[in-house]
Amino acid sequence: MGLQQSKEELVYQQVNYGNADGIRALRAQGAGLEWIDKEGKTPLMVASMRPDLINVVQVLIELGANVNAYRPGSYCGTALHHAAKKGLEQTVHLLLSHGANPFITNDDCHTALDLAREKGHVNVVRAIEGRISLFCGWMRENYGPGFLEAFAPQFLTRKIWAVILPREARNQTRPLKLELTIYPELQASKPQAVIKLWKCQLEEPKFNQANPSVTIFDKGTRTRYKLLPVCEGDKQQLQWFYSACCGIPQVASMVPAQPANAPLPNPSSASSLPSVISTPSKEDAELAMAINASILSAIAEGVPDVQPITTTTATNDWGNPPSNSLNGWGPPDTSAPSKTSGQVPVVTSSSSTYNGWDVPGTSSGQSSSKHNKSQNSTFVVPQEALPSLPVPTAPPLAVGTFYDGPIQYPSIDSTPVDVTMPSADGGTAVSSAKPAENEGDAKPAESDANASNSGNTPPGTCVICLDAPVEGACIPCGHMAGCMSCLKDIESKKWGCPICRAKINQIIRLYAV
């Protein structure tokens, strides 16, 4: 009688057969989906290695199979590694869309993207890069000597396909490491250069120039890269590229455009074009939703727009400037946007009658007719504007904030402190300090008597054990710090006086007389 197979092993066999209905039936009976064969492969890994089992991959993922299950060994890894190695683009898209981690490395320290590049699967490379890249698009690179740029700059640039990729998943505890990957063409699977941006010095482009560029200096190889937008003067694309180099993902999709001298792709590869489109991650979508919600709440509360709105007049710069009067302390020229109109500003005239002071007794109709007759009048858009928000001011200073007289410091109390030391036999205190009219004439005996009668201070105890009375003194500093047992212990360990940390040459016992 043979051994009965488990339900998990039956699921593995149904995957090899491509029987999706059988897999669902076994799963309904409680069968697991993570059975491992003798080679370490799970059912999802087996289905990810065959192009005809794309429907089985879909069923296993829907039933709860672990897309990041790891298979140890050389040229192994997760199901995404196996699909990328086989060049199965649809399977790669399916795994990535259901939470497969593209940053997991196998035992050879290779990611799924590395395996796809090594095997030459261009479509899989573009699919993975389109999912995780911060920027991908055509750029121009200067490859000639720097002194020739002034003579023939158009002949010293070449088109490249630039992709900015993170090396690992986003982690809030450490900065994100980015790589700039340069391909000579879109159909190339292996990059021409890989630049580690966290080891490079990035120069910000000067957008005031006609044709700005981004300069990247690799400190490790001492190589300088100068990149320009594919269209001369396209500052928007250069801004996207520079922001991606700084770690800011781009929401705008960078659809790759074929260069003029590139061969036409095959129809099969053209169908994979949407895979190159950069899609924002879940964190970016949540951040965009939060920003939009804050903007809508600000509009609903009537917060005025802080961006200045310049108005143009027909006076050929001979009219009054649109700046506020009294060096910026006058009333604003534009009113706050209304709730119903969103961010539509209400444009008013930059100058008014009598420099902001209207003649009393004139109505609004008379003033409007005067403005219509003037040449530098502007059209006023009727909007329901909210009253201007009060400008916060600093609180007034109190009268006694500043003092002109001399500074009065507190007086120093010169009264001596009473110090009481009990005797070793438990008797009365024998030494103290007594305040007297003339401190130099005070006698020790009188001080001891006063100290024994005063109950202001507790009897002296050992500062180390806080239990025994003070019995010894440290020589040469003379501090009466503690009992003999504690002081002997400190002397044997050569720790020094517990009060002043001075070196102890001798410990003497004190006797009360």
From Swiss-Prot:
Pfam families in alphabetical order: Ank (PF00023), Ank_2 (PF12796), zf-C3HC4_3 (PF13920)
Enzyme Commission number: 2.3.2.27
Keyword Chaperone: no
Catalytic activity line of the entry: S-ubiquitinyl-[E2 ubiquitin-conjugating enzyme]-L-cysteine + [acceptor protein]-L-lysine = [E2 ubiquitin-conjugating enzyme]-L-cysteine + N(6)-ubiquitinyl-[acceptor protein]-L-lysine
Cross-referenced PROSITE patterns: ANK_REP_REGION, ANK_REPEAT, ZF_RING_2
Segments of skewed composition (Basic and acidic residues): 436-446
One GO-annotated biological process of the protein: protein ubiquitination
Mapped zinc finger ranges (RING-type): 462-501
Region described as Disordered: spans on this chain: 309-378, 423-455
Compositionally biased intervals (Low complexity): 361-378
Keywords: ANK repeat, Metal-binding, Repeat, Transferase, Ubl conjugation pathway, Zinc, Zinc-finger
ANK repeat intervals: 39-69, 75-104, 108-137
GO MF annotation list: transferase activity; zinc ion binding
Biased composition (Polar residues): 309-327, 335-355
Pathway(s) per entry: Protein modification; protein ubiquitination
PANTHER family, per the entry: E3 UBIQUITIN-PROTEIN LIGASE XBAT35, ROLLING PEBBLES, ISOFORM B
Protein name in the entry: Probable E3 ubiquitin-protein ligase XBOS34
Organism for this UniProt entry: Oryza sativa subsp. japonica
Lineage: Eukaryota, Viridiplantae, Streptophyta, Embryophyta, Tracheophyta
Gene: XBOS34
